[in-house]
């Protein structure tokens, strides 16, 4: 389980704006939920999908 979320590590979940998931993939989340979003990315506020490290996620795609 992700210590900061209600989903299994490596699994996917729907996160609230205050979520701080780190071990799972957020299928629906706000900027504060995605630790892989680079700072200053304007598109992050519109939601993103984290798939791993910052160089492997499409938060700003």
Curated annotation (Swiss-Prot):
Q: Which domain of life is it from?
A: Eukaryota
The UniProt entry, under SUPFAM superfamilies, shows: Metallothionein
Recorded GO terms, molecular function?
zinc ion binding
**Gene Ontology biological process terms, A to Z:** cellular response to cadmium ion; cellular response to copper ion; cellular response to zinc ion; detoxification of copper ion; intracellular zinc ion homeostasis; negative regulation of growth
Residue numbers bearing the N-acetylmethionine modification = 1
Where, by residue number, does a divalent metal cation 4 bind? 33-34, 44, 48
Where a divalent metal cation 2 binds, per the record, is at: 7, 13, 15, 26
Enumerate the residues binding a divalent metal cation 3: 15, 19, 24, 29
Where is the region Beta?
1-29
Keyword Thylakoid in record? no
Q: Which UniProt keywords apply?
A: Acetylation, Metal-binding, Metal-thiolate cluster
Q: List positions binding a divalent metal cation 6.
A: 37, 41, 44, 60
- Spans annotated as Alpha: 30-61
The residues that hold a divalent metal cation 1 are 5, 7, 21, 24
PROSITE patterns listed in its UniProt record = METALLOTHIONEIN_VRT
Q: Which GO terms describe its cellular component?
A: cytoplasm; nucleus
User: Into which family does the record put it?
Assistant: Belongs to the metallothionein superfamily. Type 1 family.
According to the UniProt entry, the note on domains is: Class I metallothioneins contain 2 metal-binding domains: four divalent ions are chelated within cluster A of the alpha domain and are coordinated via cysteinyl thiolate bridges to 11 cysteine ligands. Cluster B, the corresponding region within the beta domain, can ligate three divalent ions to 9 cysteines.
Its annotated function is as follows: Metallothioneins have a high content of cysteine residues that bind various heavy metals.
Spell out the protein name for this chain.
Metallothionein
């Amino acid at each position: 389980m992700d210590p900061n979320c209600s989903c299994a590590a490596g699994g996917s979940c729907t996160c609230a704006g205050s979520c701080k998931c780190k071990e799972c993939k957020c299928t629906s989340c706000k900027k504060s939920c995605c630790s892989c979003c680079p700072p200053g990315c304007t598109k992050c506020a519109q939601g993103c999908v984290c798939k791993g490290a910052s160089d492997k996620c499409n938060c700003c795609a």
